[in-house]
Amino acid sequence: MCELYSKQDTLALRERHIGPSCKIFFAADPIKIMRAQGQYMFDEKGERYLDCINNVAHVGHCHPEVVKAAAKQMELLNTNSRFLHDNIIEFAKRLTATLPQELSVCYFTNSGSEANDLALRLARQFRGHQDVITLDHAYHGHLSSLIEISPYKFQKGKDVKRETVHVAPAPDTYRGKYREDHEDPSTAYADEVKKIIEEAHSSGRKIAAFIAESMQSCGGQIIPPAGYFQKVAEHIHKAGGVFIADEVQVGFGRVGRYFWSFQMYGEDFVPDIVTMGKPMGNGHPISCVVTTKEIAEAFSSSGMEYFNTYGGNPVSCAVGLAVLDVIEKENLQGNAVRVGTYLMELLSEQKAKHPLIGDIRGVGLFIGIDLVKDREKRTPATAEAQHIIYEMKGKGVLLSADGPHRNVLKIKPPMCFTEDDAKFLVDHLDGILTVLEEAMDSKSGTVFSENTAYRTKMPKEIQVELPNLSATEAREIPRGKRNGVCSDQQALLSKRLKT
């Protein structure tokens, strides 16, 4: 790719022509990316960066099979979804084959936000109820209907929570209301949802849906305790509502053993609606809502046609099919287990070594490192997290920090991430943490405060029962091919490390 402008000119033109609310990574010192391949990105100087946060390029940046599928279909046909063509049917068939039998009807859209917006419409049409229960710190998209149900956004701005929206505590067993030492955190958190339902009913309100990411991403890489979703679904169904599982950031095999993250919680948990996006097209805009026939028929009974000009177009579906093919052919679910297990093992060693690491939680290639100033108090190390991501960038590793305190390092790399990549990441993290902690010790426990000059430069921008698996055992998992969900022999979940 030829560089049109210098980095300085690109920044100046962006400031002039792009809205100021459109933020970029590393705003204090942004990277100008010119090309990417696999798990690597390259700047205008040819410097290589290991991409550990871009879960859009799911099977790897510019994967040749995906590029080929897009170009081939673009040369042949691209049109709107009112014309009959095979790609949309084949894609719907392949997608639903990875899901429980009840989830059999697809609506194709173009982004995760579109998918979640449509999911709300389906839920509200189903029984005519209007209220929605969401989790604290949740983010479900940028549309007005989704900002309303995203505390991650509306709590930071001037928007006021609408009376149709109810916020339940995030099921965080590390720093939430009910922690790992609670006798039954799943029931305690689910009872919070039950309480919200009862209070809504006492005010004459009716619950249309409960919506949650199968694992909270922007909320801090949170994995709910086992049994939580089952209990919540029971309460929601009794209230006449539906359960929406948002898989936009965590689906398509990222957790390893399962194709969809909600499947980690057991066969007795089946959402009524599943939304998907981001990795679905490996960077191409495509998303989908999958639901039951009953809910789809209720939506149709309104008499209003649902039409999305580009949703399910031939090119998008060809790209989506290619992504599914690559996941299967390259056994990327198995890779997520092998590399994820190895990475968690390396990080557990770092946790024992570095007091700044309060908690490590993750499944497959979805991992969060919760940084703290004090392990006992679990005081979020927000400024330190920002320092670390900039230092890691200087070492050629791209990370970001998120969560309500922006102190959780997010690791969500392309699925072709290797063990060598994992070691490269951890080796540099180890070095940076060592230097930082030495500086903190010399200054009585803190280097950066929220008000330091350094801080002002920063961008403002399941727990489940799992087998104990060593990295060696994980690497010995067979690399066999299989359509849909990997078998137990192919993949096992990474375990969540406790404090």
Swiss-Prot record:
What do we know about how this protein assembles, alone or with others? Homotetramer.
Pfam families in alphabetical order: Aminotran_3 (PF00202)
Keyword annotations for this protein? Lyase, Mitochondrion, Pyridoxal phosphate
What InterPro entries does this protein's entry cite? Aminotrans_3 (IPR005814), Aminotrans_3_PPA_site (IPR049704), PyrdxlP-dep_Trfase (IPR015424), PyrdxlP-dep_Trfase_major (IPR015421), PyrdxlP-dep_Trfase_small (IPR015422)
- Places the protein is found: Mitochondrion
Tell me which cofactor or cofactors this protein depends on. pyridoxal 5'-phosphate
Output this protein's name.
Answer: Ethanolamine-phosphate phospho-lyase
- GO cellular component annotations of the record: membrane; mitochondrion
- The reaction(s) this protein catalyses: phosphoethanolamine + H2O = acetaldehyde + NH4(+) + phosphate
Keyword hit for Mitochondrion? yes
Question: Domain of life here?
Answer: Eukaryota
The answer to whether keyword Lyase applies is yes
What is its EC class? lyase
Query: What's its EC?
Result: 4.2.3.2
Show the GO MF annotations. ethanolamine-phosphate phospho-lyase activity; pyridoxal phosphate binding; transaminase activity
Annotated family: Belongs to the class-III pyridoxal-phosphate-dependent aminotransferase family.
Which species does the entry assign this protein to? Mus musculus
Q: Which PANTHER family match?
A: ETHANOLAMINE-PHOSPHATE PHOSPHO-LYASE, PTHR45688
Summarizing the function annotation, the protein's role is: Catalyzes the pyridoxal-phosphate-dependent breakdown of phosphoethanolamine, converting it to ammonia, inorganic phosphate and acetaldehyde.
